[in-house]
Structures are given as structure tokens and as C-alpha cells.
């Protein structure tokens, strides 16, 4: 039995299978998941697990070269944005798009991880980097 890292087998496999430029989305309770895109639903109840908890685990286990966020988070959820930005390495590129465009972009991700987060625009697309 694995005792460190990502213990959830679905999340671990997703992280293990990511190649350079592959994308994965971590989303709040309300983010729609396009047909055909795998959804890993971690939500237990409203707020559990939080967006930040899931993001922390993924940032510890994958190399991220770019993140994509909804422009609307800047005004609608600045506390969430501040905490999120504080976790990113200086080398990570940040792109802001409209929330509608971010939802369209989820059609190309490897999977959407649904959290119990109940605050607005708590969604991120992580683009995998390369270690060489």
C-alpha cells in the first residue's frame, strides 16, 4: 500500500500519465464537465475538500509550467486568487481567460477533478511541464 504522495488511485494515475503540455482541471462544485471528459469527483459535502487542499496535493506531485484561470476570479474571489498565486513557482506562466472560455477549454483536458469548493470561480487548468 502506498503511504506517501497522492493516495487516491484515480488522481495518482492521472498525475502519473500526464505528459508535457497535458492539462488537468481542478474545479469547484458548479463547474460543468463536458461529455466524454473523465470526472474525478472528490466532493463529500459543500466545502469539503476545498479547492486549495486539492491544488496543494497536485502542485506537490506534478511539474506545472502554466495555469489558466478565469478573469472573473480577480474581482469575485480575490482571497482565493491570492492564496493560489502564493503557491505557484515564479517560473509558472499565468493566463487569464473569461469564465466561459475556461469552461470551453475543459473540453481538451485529460480530466476534471471536482472538489467541494463553494466559492465563485475556484477553477484552474494546470498545464504539465517537463523535467528535462
UniProtKB/Swiss-Prot annotation:
Alphabetically list the UniProt keywords: Carbohydrate metabolism, Cytoplasm, Isomerase
EC assignment: 5.4.99.62
| Pfam families with a match to the protein in the record | RbsD_FucU
Keyword Isomerase applies: yes
Q: In which pathway does it act?
A: Carbohydrate metabolism; D-ribose degradation; D-ribose 5-phosphate from beta-D-ribopyranose: step 1/2
Q: Give one GO biological process term.
A: D-ribose catabolic process
Q: Which residues form the active site?
A: 20 (proton donor)
This protein is called D-ribose pyranase
Species the sequence originates in? Streptococcus agalactiae serotype Ia (strain ATCC 27591 / A909 / CDC SS700)
Q: Which gene encodes it?
A: rbsD
Amino acid at each position: 500500500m502506498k503511504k506517501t504522495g497522492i493516495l487516491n488511485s484515480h488522481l495518482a494515475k492521472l498525475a502519473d500519465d500526464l505528459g508535457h503540455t497535458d492539462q488537468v482541471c481542478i474545479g469547484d462544485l458548479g463547474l460543468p464537465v463536458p461529455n466524454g471528459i473523465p470526472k474525478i469527483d472528490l466532493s463529500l459535502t459543500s466545502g469539503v475538500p476545498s479547492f486549495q487542499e486539492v491544488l496543494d496535493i497536485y502542485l506537490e506531485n506534478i511539474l506545472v509550467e502554466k495555469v489558466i484561470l478565469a478573469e472573473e476570479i480577480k474581482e469575485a474571489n480575490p482571497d482565493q486568487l491570492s492564496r493560489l498565486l502564493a503557491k505557484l513557482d515564479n517560473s509558472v506562466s499565468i493566463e487569464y481567460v473569461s469564465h466561459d472560455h475556461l469552461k470551453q477549454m475543459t473540453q481538451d483536458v485529460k480530466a476534471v477533478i471536482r472538489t467541494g469548493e463553494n466559492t465563485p470561480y475556484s477553477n484552474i487548468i494546470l498545464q504539465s511541464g517537463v523535467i528535462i
